[in-house]
Amino acid sequence: MQKESISFIILAAGKGSRMRSNTPKVLHSLAGEPIIFHILRKILSLSNKITLKKIIIVLGHESELVKKDISSNFSGINFAIQDKQYGTAHAVLSAKDLLINTRGKVIVLCGDTPLISIKLMLDLIKLSKNVDLGVSVFKTLNPFGYGRVILNKLNKVFSIIEEKDANKSQKSINLCNTGIYISDISLLFKLLSLVKFNSNKKEMYLTDIV
């Protein structure tokens, strides 16, 4: 059986200001090493199950420091720079040039999710054989702060509403977005080209590709 060709975009440009630390968020330590290292090790462990094409890490805050730490411990990692913090869709677009000649599918995830499981990534890859765009979701008793997932009558994801944009009814929804997606590379950037810049919030939401 032919292995799926998969690339990864890891979003790691944020400052992590809520941590009240000068250390870049993805370099905070968990079990003795930076949290992004845990993600990279899990991705690399998939190489016997998939054709791993590219790993791209989108950097912003303290980019040289993050790049140095990662490059000292891992080889073959690509880096893209998000110069201005214009949201998650803008961050993914920063990686476009590095994937322009790459075929296959891409998983997009955040660099502060060290507990992501190998099983979840494999489940997404399996899901992508039957859908154009796959989104990982979860249910929680306390959905505050997460994007709410709206389903259609066929129980498919219809849209994702960010917490700050949700009305009272939408805020009661307990099905939430993990921020992990899978799509064909060319389709992802086609969808991103349709995402509009929100001039009031100075952001482009990745959730708008749904």
Feature names for model-found ranges:
Residues 26, 76-78, 156:
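Conserved beta-strand segments of alpha/beta enzyme cores
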Residues 157-210:
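Catalytic-core segments of class I nucleotidyltransferases/pyrophosphorylases
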Residues 103, 140-169:
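Rossmann-like NAD(P)H-binding beta-loop-alpha module
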Residues 119-144:
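Conserved donor-nucleotide/metal-binding helix-loop-beta segment in metal-dependent transferases, i.e.
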Residues 1-21:
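N-terminal nucleotide-binding beta1-loop-alpha1 segment
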Residues 29, 115, 182:
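Short aromatic/basic micro-patch
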